[in-house]
Regions:
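A charged N-terminal "starter" segment
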Residues: 1-124, 130-143, 166, 181, ...
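Short beta-strand segments
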Residues: 61, 128, 144-150, 195-197
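Active-site loop/helix belt of alpha/beta enzymes
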Residues: 3, 139, 151-202
Length: 202
């Protein structure tokens, strides 16, 4: 996988993003502003896509950049969109994402948010706490789910520790078998997979 060079360059007496002069962008939109280069987005996405096996699906995490134009662009070329709130769910739907291609992950999901996405339609929900599981049980709406757990021996060299001990980001590994049994016992929950971070920020 290669990292794209910066699209910003000085050419023909002007600073440009790709072939678009910054002076023209400022004249049209004023400042301050954010400008995104679609060519760079595509280049980075395609580079990652080519580096991974075909069996791996790519999801764009809306929290990385919720700009509607960026989300719409990735909704068209990525396998799906990952959301972390009901607000991001609405961004995904407005971006044209198919409901089966929306994945709800992240700690702190409220019962109201879970009901909101279930009523609207969702591809998959990642369960990260007993409270979330209890809410899904009580709502009684069929949905694909995965269980997020923290491996007993996780790496600890980064800014965030996401393995090794219980945390808000999933179940302790010692509770995994029990949690799997609990999910499988609920008729309207379809266990689709497991979610884990083998290290930090990976």
């Amino acid at each position: 996988m290669t990292i794209a060079h910066s699209p910003i360059a000085y050419k023909d007496g002007q600073w440009r993003i790709s072939e678009c002069a910054l002076s023209e962008i400022v004249a049209e939109y004023s400042t301050p502003l954010f400008a995104y280069d679609r060519h760079t987005l595509d280049s980075q996405f395609n580079s990652l896509r080519q580096a991974l096996p075909d069996v791996v699906d790519l999801y764009y995490s809306i929290k990385a950049n919720p700009n509607p134009a960026v989300v719409s662009h990735f909704a068209a070329c990525a396998a799906g969109l990952e959301i972390a709130s009901a607000a991001e769910y609405e961004i995904a739907r407005n971006a044209g994402a198919q409901i089966e291609n929306i994945l709800f992950a992240g700690p702190g999901k409220t019962a109201e948010e879970l009901e909101h996405v279930l009523r609207g339609g969702i591809g998959e929900i990642h369960i990260e706490s007993s409270e979330e599981l209890a809410a899904l049980e009580s709502l009684g709406i069929p949905v694909n789910v995965s269980i997020r757990f923290n491996p007993a021996s996780g790496a600890s060299g980064g800014a965030m520790r996401m393995g090794g001990k219980p945390s808000p980001f999933g179940f302790d590994e010692e509770l995994l078998a029990e949690t799997v049994d609990r999910v499988r016992a609920v008729e309207h929950l379809n266990l689709h997979g497991l979610h884990m971070f083998a290290g930090t920020q990976l």
